[in-house]
Regions:
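Hot-dog-fold acyl-thioester-processing enzymes
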Residues: 1-54, 110-133
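HotDog/MaoC-like acyl-thioester-processing domains
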Residues: 3, 67-68, 79-133
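Hydrophobic beta-strand-centered segment that forms part of the acyl-chain substrate-binding groove
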Residues: 35-73, 77-85, 102, 106
Length: 133
C-alpha cells in the first residue's frame, strides 16, 4: 500500500465549508501520479514511446466530508483485472483515521492509439505485484 498525506486548502471548500466534491478527484489524481512516480513510472517518457495510460472509469463514494485545514491521507492499492489496472484509493481524515472517500479507478493502456491487453502493466508494476501478492 502507498499513502500520501495532504492538507485541505480553504479555497477547495464550497459554501457549506466542506471540500467540494470535484476536489476529491484532484486529490486522487495527484496521489496516483505520485504513487506511479515512486514506482519509477514516467507518463511523459511512456507517451514519447507511444504508450499512454488512460483513465477509463472512476467511481467515488463520499462517506464523510473533509473541511478546511483537515489533514488527510490518500491510501492506494492496485491490481490487474483483465486488460485493466484497478487502482483503489481511499481518503482518510487523519483526525481519528476516519474514512472520508472511497475511490476506484480503472486504467487502460494504449499503444500508439490502440487498446492493449494490459501487458505493459505487468512489466511496469512487476515489483509491486510481486511484493503485494
Amino acid at each position: 500500500m502507498y499513502s500520501l498525506g495532504m492538507k485541505v486548502r480553504d479555497y477547495e471548500c464550497d459554501i457549506q465549508r466542506v471540500v467540494n466534491n470535484a476536489n476529491y478527484q484532484h486529490y486522487m489524481e495527484h496521489a496516483r501520479h505520485e504513487f506511479l512516480e515512486s514506482l519509477g513510472v514516467s507518463f511523459s517518457a511512456l507517451h514519447e514511446q507511444g504508450l499512454d495510460l488512460m483513465v477509463s472509469k472512476i467511481t467515488i463514494e463520499y462517506k464523510r466530508p473533509l473541511r478546511g485545514s483537515d489533514m488527510f491521507e490518500v491510501r492506494i492499492n492496485m491490481e490487474r483485472k483483465g486488460a485493466k489496472l484497478i487502482i483503489r484509493q481511499d481518503i482518510y481524515n487523519l483526525d481519528g483515521d476516519v474514512l472520508a472517500t472511497k475511490g476506484e479507478v480503472e486504467v487502460i493502456c494504449l499503444d500508439n492509439g490502440r487498446l492493449t491487453r494490459g501487458e505493459l502493466f505487468d512489466k511496469l508494476f512487476k515489483d509491486y505485484f510481486d511484493k503485494n501478492a
